[in-house]
Every structure is written in C-alpha cells, then in structure tokens.
Amino acid sequence: MAKSSRATLALLIYGILMRYSQCTPIGMGFPNMRLDNDVFGDEGNSLSELSYEPDTMSARSRPALPEDAYTLYYPPERRAETHADGLLDRALRDILVQLSARKYLHSLTAVRVGEEEEDEEDSEPLSKRHSDGIFTDSYSRYRKQMAVKKYLAAVLGRRYRQRFRNKGRRLVVPSVWTGIRDTVIITPEKRGKRY
C-alpha cells in the first residue's frame, strides 16, 4: 500500500513538473538563436552580403494564434454547418436517453411484477397482467366464499339452508300503522309474519 501511494505521488509530481516545463516560457529553455546582420560561413568568415531582411524572417516566426481556438478549427463559412450538426446531435442524444430510460423503467417494473426478462414482442402489457390479477383474486375470493357456505350448510344442516334460500326473498316494507320499517319474509309457510 505504501509503495503504491509513493509511486502515485512520484508520478503526480513528475506529471506536474513536465506539464509546467513544457507549457510555460520560464520552464524549458529553447535554444538561443541570434540572427544578426552578420552571417558567418563554415570557416568562420563573415558573409555580410547575405543579410536577412525582417520581412523574410517573419515567414519563419511562429504564426500568431487567435485567441479563440474555435475560429482556428471552424472557419466562419462552416460554423453554421457545425452548429446545425451540434443541434441535431444533441436532439438525437436526448431522444436516445429517453428511450433507454423508458426501457430501463419497463425492465424494473417487469421485475417487480414478477416477469422474467423477455422480448418486447412476447411480453404482455402491464395493464393486461394487472386486470388478469384482479380477476384471479376476485375469482379465488368467490371460490373461498362458496366453500365456506357449503361447509356451513353441511355443518348447520337444514336450518342454515332454509335461511340461505329465503335471503333473496326478504322485502323491506314500511308499515303504515306504526311508521317503522319492518322486514317481511314472503314464503309459502310464513306468509305475512314480521321479524
């Protein structure tokens, strides 16, 4: 661990020093070239007849860089093209992000509901699965109620069955004489009795 951190620190310091030595004029010194009007040949003799004019030297000097690098890489006649391309790229990127987000959310909801990863064509929509689940729950609840009723009918015998049969025939009739609502059961053996 200590060797790793030392090596990382040394690499970081080396990188910083190299960056500043190449980027600043103070760091790395360039070879000093003095071009005076006196030009010397191979033997060391003065060649004054070959003097360099400042006009010819300006061609060799470093070109002045524009302050904005954008103008260097994209000339004014191509800026409209690149701007339109950038807008199109940004719009396409936004659309792709939305599509991938929808697909990701769909996969999350499918996993929560209990569906395994399937193809888009084979999977049912979530609303259909939801309605199927509601129907299954309602049907299973109905089956349980019928099983309980059947059990009670078997245990309680005839009395429960008779009461269950008459449940649909009970009527709520207001009594004219008392002004109170009474329940009247209409069956062949109990005609007109009040409960």
Swiss-Prot record:
One cellular-component annotation, GO: extracellular region
PROSITE patterns for the chain: GLUCAGON (PS00260)
Residue segments, region Disordered: 113-132
Record has Glycosyltransferase as a keyword: no
Functional note: Primary role of GHRH is to release GH from the pituitary. PACAP plays pivotal roles as a neurotransmitter and/or a neuromodulator.
Keyword annotations of the record: Amidation, Cleavage on pair of basic residues, Hormone, Secreted, Signal
Protein name as catalogued: Glucagon family neuropeptides
Residue numbers covered by the propeptide annotation in the UniProt entry: 21-82, 171-195
Signal peptide start and end residues: 1-20
Family: Belongs to the glucagon family.
Subcellular location: Secreted
Entry's Gene Ontology BP terms: adenylate cyclase-activating G protein-coupled receptor signaling pathway; neuron projection development; neuropeptide signaling pathway; positive regulation of ERK1 and ERK2 cascade; regulation of protein localization
Keyword set includes Repeat: no
Record-linked Pfam families: Hormone_2
Primary residence: secreted
Transmembrane domains' residue ranges: none
Compositional bias ranges of the Acidic residues kind: 115-124
Positions of post-translational Lysine amide modification: 167
Organism: Clarias macrocephalus
GO molecular function: neuropeptide hormone activity; peptide hormone receptor binding; pituitary adenylate cyclase activating polypeptide activity
Tissue spec. comment: Brain, testis, ovary and stomach. Not pancreas, pituitary, muscle and liver.
InterPro entries per the UniProt record, alphabetical: Glucagon_GIP_secretin_VIP, VIP/GHRH-like
Origin: domain of life: Eukaryota
